[in-house]
Every structure is written in structure tokens, then in C-alpha cells.
């Protein structure tokens, strides 16, 4: 995928099993000028990524049914076509080890729930301008 396509895509993949959180995230993403592809579990996010790499970013809940956010990130970092997609990990867990695991796996930013609109918008903007999303996970 060319860098021109990378910059022009306006879609963000959102995976969270909480319907209220999905609505919250989607509404803010829309206000920021992006379209959302929204799923309620990790397995569905994985299926989408297997056939569609045209996303500006991914926002994944840490704990979801079937496949966790960390597993999605690990998969993305093994696929060259997905490595350019920056990822925000969100979690209700306030655990520094969990945060560290997210960054080691390849997350670009980490946001702990609960968060407010301003916190999410700021983190989203950081995510969308981050140029280090293509880093590879150490083997």
C-alpha cells in the first residue's frame, strides 16, 4: 500500500465488547473526521484485518471475547501490510505490566478506562500523527 493511500484513508477499526463504549468511541472518531468499522469482539477484528488493511488506525479493548487486543496487535505486527497501522489499546485495568506488554506487542498508545472525551481526543490525535507505528515486535 502506498504512503499516499496510508494518509488518505479515513477509516478506523474499533473493537470493543461494550456497546456503550463502542458508541462513545464511534461518535468521537466521527467528530474527528474519520469513519469507523466497528466490531464487538477480537475475532471479528482479526477476520477483517485478514482481508482489509485500509485503516488509518485501530482502537482495541484489551479484554474481549474470543481474541484479546494484545493478540490482534501481535498478529498485525507479523503482517507487513498491517505494520503501518498505529494502534490504541484501551483497558479498564490500571496495571503497569499490562501497559508495558501492550507497548512491547506493538501498541502505539494506551488509554486507561474510564476516560473523558478530551482524554480520548488527545490520545486519538497522538495516535493519528504517530510515525513509529511500523516498528516490528522483537522475536
Ranges and model annotations:
Residues 22, 65-66, 83, 95:
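The feature encodes the CheY-like receiver
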Residues 115-124:
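C-terminal output helix
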Residues 108:
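Short, glycine/charged-rich "phosphate-handling" switch motifs in NTP-dependent
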Residues 33-40, 48:
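Short hydrophobic/Thr-rich beta-strand motif most characteristic of the beta2 strand and flanking loop
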Residues 23-31:
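Charged docking surfaces used in two-component/phosphorelay signaling
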Residues 53-60:
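Active-site beta3 strand of CheY-like receiver
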Amino acid at each position: 500500500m502506498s504512503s499516499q493511500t496510508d494518509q488518505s484513508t479515513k477509516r478506523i477499526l474499533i473493537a470493543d465488547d461494550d456497546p456503550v463504549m463502542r458508541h462513545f468511541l464511534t461518535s468521537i472518531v466521527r467528530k474527528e473526521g474519520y469513519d469507523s468499522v466497528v466490531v464487538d469482539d477480537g475475532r471479528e477484528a482479526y477476520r477483517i484485518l485478514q482481508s482489509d488493511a485500509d485503516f488509518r488506525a485501530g482502537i482495541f479493548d484489551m479484554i474481549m471475547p474470543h481474541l484479546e487486543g494484545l493478540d490482534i496487535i501481535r498478529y498485525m505486527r507479523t503482517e507487513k501490510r498491517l505494520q503501518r497501522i498505529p494502534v490504541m489499546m484501551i483497558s479498564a485495568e490500571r496495571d503497569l505490566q499490562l501497559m508495558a506488554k501492550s507497548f512491547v506487542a506493538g501498541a502505539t498508545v494506551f488509554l486507561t478506562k474510564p476516560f473523558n472525551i478530551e482524554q480520548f481526543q488527545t490520545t486519538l490525535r497522538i495516535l493519528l500523527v504517530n510515525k513509529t507505528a511500523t516498528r516490528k515486535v522483537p522475536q
